[in-house]
């Protein structure tokens, strides 16, 4: 019987599986992989904003600031932070002149 068509049905007042090959190592491995996939999917949906922002902005190295005055460094940091803050919302209003 296929994994897709197995249904748990009441058998003698107990819940059980009608298939006889449930102790098959392949079925056990598929179950473990399915559970891990579900856990990873849930974590991805819970933390997607943190995860993808980290990949988008955190892994990029900015330009070298060697020889740049501190005031210009601070201005650059503020621009980078404002770019990250814009990404917080789902919609961004763009005004064309």
Swiss-Prot record:
This is Matrix protein 2. A lipid is attached at residue 50 (S-palmitoyl cysteine). The M2 protein from most influenza A strains is inhibited by amantadine and rimantadine, resulting in viral uncoating incapacity. Emergence of amantadine-resistant variants is usually rapid. Its main location: virion. Belongs to the influenza viruses matrix protein M2 family. When the channel is activated, one or more imidazole moieties of His-37 probably become bi-protonated. The keyword Lipoprotein applies. Pfam families: Flu_M2 (PF00599). Glycans are attached at residue 20. The keyword Phosphoprotein applies. It comes from the Viruses. Forms a proton-selective ion channel that is necessary for the efficient release of the viral genome during virus entry. After attaching to the cell surface, the virion enters the cell by endocytosis. Acidification of the endosome triggers M2 ion channel activity. Keywords: Disulfide bond, Glycoprotein, Host cell membrane, Host membrane, Host-virus interaction, Hydrogen ion transport, Inhibition of host autophagy by virus, Ion channel, Ion transport, Lipoprotein, Membrane, Palmitate, Phosphoprotein, Signal-anchor, Transmembrane, Transmembrane helix, Transport, Viral ion channel, Virion. One of its GO terms (molecular function) is monoatomic ion channel activity. The record marks 37 as: Essential for channel activity, possibly by being protonated during channel activation, and by forming the channel gate and the selective filter. Gene3D superfamilies: 6.10.250.1640. Residues 1-22 are virion surface. The modification Phosphoserine is found at residues 64, 82. GO terms for biological process: protein complex oligomerization; symbiont genome entry into host cell via pore formation in plasma membrane; symbiont-mediated suppression of host autophagy.
């Amino acid at each position: 019987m296929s994994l897709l068509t197995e249904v748990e049905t009441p058998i003698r007042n107990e819940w059980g599986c009608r298939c006889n090959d449930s102790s098959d190592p392949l079925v056990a491995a598929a179950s473990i992989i399915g559970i891990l996939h579900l856990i990873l999917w849930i974590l991805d949906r819970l933390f997607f904003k943190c995860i993808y922002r980290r990949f988008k902005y955190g892994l990029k190295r900015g330009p070298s600031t060697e020889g740049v005055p501190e005031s210009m460094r601070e201005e650059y940091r503020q621009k980078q932070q404002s770019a990250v803050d814009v990404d917080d919302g789902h919609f961004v209003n763009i005004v064309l002149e």
